[in-house]
């Protein structure tokens, strides 16, 4: 039977992905992408549901991945607690959605976290203050930067953003608009410009909850495209990681690689291919990353431990 154009494109996409993943599935790419002088870390978002809707399954696979390649830290890209954030540092969700879910020994490393739109429904300051209760939880401020050494000669600067004030609020979030409106976007934008300008690290990675571009349910974020993307281009940022859409995606805007890791729980299957899409799948899962001096290896893994996609981001001059 003759294939339609859509069937042909889908077949070609699957075949191309299978070819690309073949060396990784055999273990050769993992070994090549994980030299002794490298930084391993995990990224997950949109997760805090009292262990429900695949959260426990994803947590289990994160632990197994970190057993294989020990993660120095974990990045949470926001929407840490559903549906309405946390009320205080004593909120039961700290236990039911975090401490009692990510229990693997390999996950007892620093978690560097940012806020998502659902976190804005609750007490944002409590997420900053919780570090005093649990040393592995880290959110020094609503936006911040930090540096990690890759090896003796190379470092990476991470820039953690507070993107909810940059987003178009959903109808059910309008009651929380005061919390969002109180944030000074111009100040955050000036901070990011200055921080990127001051960075001398060969690797620059930006983390936000909301996407630049996305084929997922929420789609693109116009403010980020207009105001943040030009800064990423200007200062040679290699990668931007986000959540918000409950799926796994790799998109590209010029030389900047955009990764969605919003599959921490309750996946959404609505996903379309855009002009920027390189990969996308509506499923639960997370990202395992390995950063060496010359390349960043990104692996997308689902809640059953299946490797769905892998790619390498080269260092930019």
Language-model features and meaning:
Residues 41-43, 74-76, 113, 206, ...:
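Residue-level marker for buried hydrophobic side chains located in beta-strands
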């Amino acid at each position: 039977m003759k294939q339609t154009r859509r069937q042909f494109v889908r077949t070609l996409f699957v075949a191309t992905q299978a070819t690309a993943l073949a060396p990784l599935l055999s273990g050769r790419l993992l070994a090549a992408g994980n030299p002794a002088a490298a930084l391993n870390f995990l990224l997950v978002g949109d997760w805090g549901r009292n262990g429900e809707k695949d959260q426990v399954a994803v947590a289990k696979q994160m632990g197994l991945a970190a057993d294989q390649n020990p993660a120095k830290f974990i990045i949470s890209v926001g929407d840490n607690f559903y549906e309405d954030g946390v009320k205080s540092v004593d909120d039961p969700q700290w236990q039911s959605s975090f401490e009692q879910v990510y229990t693997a020994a390999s996950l007892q490393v620093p978690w560097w976290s940012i806020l998502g739109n659902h976190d804005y429904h609750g007490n944002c300051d409590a997420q900053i203050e919780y570090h005093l209760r649990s040393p592995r939880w880290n959110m020094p401020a609503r936006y911040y930067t930090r540096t990690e050494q890759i090896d003796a000669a190379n470092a990476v600067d991470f820039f953690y953003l507070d993107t909810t004030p940059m987003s178009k609020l959903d109808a059910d979030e309008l009651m929380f608009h005061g919390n969002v409106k109180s944030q000074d976007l111009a100040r955050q934008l000036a901070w990011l410009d200055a921080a990127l300008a001051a960075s001398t690290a060969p690797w620059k990675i930006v983390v936000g909850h909301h996407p630049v571009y996305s084929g997922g349910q929420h789609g693109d974020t116009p403010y980020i495209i207009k105001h943040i993307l030009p800064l990423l281009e200007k200062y040679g940022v290699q990668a931007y990681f986000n959540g918000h859409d409950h799926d796994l995606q790799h998109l590209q805007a010029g030389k900047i690689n955009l990764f969605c890791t919003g599959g921490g729980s309750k996946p959404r299957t609505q996903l379309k291919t855009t002009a920027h899409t390189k990969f996308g799948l509506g499923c639960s899962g997370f990202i395992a990353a390995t950063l060496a001096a010359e390349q960043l290896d990104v692996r997308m893994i689902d809640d059953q431990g299946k490797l769905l996609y892998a790619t390498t981001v080269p260092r930019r001059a």
